[in-house]
Amino acid sequence: MGLISNPTRLILVATIFFLVSSISGQDSVVENNERQESEGSGKELGRRGMVGTERIGVDTVVDNIGALGLNLDLDATAPSVFDALFSSFSMILVTEIGDETFIIAALMAMRHPKATVLSGALSALFVMTILSTGLGRIVPNLISRKHTNSAATVLYAFFGLRLLYIAWRSTDSKSNQKKEMEEVEEKLESGQGKTPFRRLFSRFCTPIFLESFILTFLAEWGDRSQIATIALATHKNAIGVAIGASIGHTVCTSLAVVGGSMLASRISQRTVATVGGLLFLGFSVSSYFYPPL
């Protein structure tokens, strides 16, 4: 009744209530705005953190790919591998067809199982290829690359000129080939190659396999194809040289075993010597004008 009877007090109380309500409403609005801003900043921070994490993940993947690329070094080594493979493969073809190892495989395949003769000859040639490639990689560590490249150039030129000289002097290639086949056949019939090494390992390998292995190994040791393989490995990719030489030996020996003496007698040694001489001279020119870096 007092408030109703006194209008002034009633107006004052209403004014105070209105002010308090306004202030509390403004406080709630401010709190809501602050809450929204904090949530927005939290989302922004989370988004930035996710972006940063993604960037770190991408950078890690890129680094891993880069490290893998550096380890593999495919772009840098692929051309040298194929170049060495082609060089060694072509070199073996022109030096081994009609050679003593070729004739040994051909004559033995006429009297013994072809698979055994082929496996023994290829085993010896693969071992010789690995040894020759290893020697070619060891020599540059003992002698400077410049001197090894010069020696390879001289060897290529020597073999090229020698093969061209053989081609020039070959007046009757068929008779010479027949004579060489008769000489090799005499060696086989005389039992040459029966050494203590053969007797030691004869208990582990068949006599035919061992005979093919030893005769091929001894005939290939010091041959021009072995020396050329060593020379190639001094300045070309060793893996490519080994693979190319192995493929070349496989092709030549397989032809010898399958074709036998007929194939050996039909091949013109003058043609083979001419092609081989030109190929070795090409190796010499390439080694001289384009030395390894």
UniProtKB/Swiss-Prot annotation:
Keywords annotated in UniProt: Membrane, Signal, Transmembrane, Transmembrane helix
A single cellular component GO annotation: Golgi apparatus
InterPro entries linked: GDT1-like, MFS_trans_sf
Tagged with keyword Transmembrane helix: yes
Signal sequence coordinates: 1-25
Pfam families, per database record: GDT1 (PF01169)
Keyword Cytoplasm applies: no
GO MF terms held by the record: metal ion transmembrane transporter activity
Transmembrane segments: 89-109, 115-135, 148-168, 200-220, 238-258, 272-292
Recorded topology in the membrane: Multi-pass membrane protein
Compartments, record wording: Membrane
Record-stated family: Belongs to the GDT1 family.
PANTHER family given in the database record: GDT1-LIKE PROTEIN 3 (PTHR12608:SF9), TRANSMEMBRANE PROTEIN HTP-1 RELATED (PTHR12608)
Protein name: GDT1-like protein 3
Organism: Arabidopsis thaliana
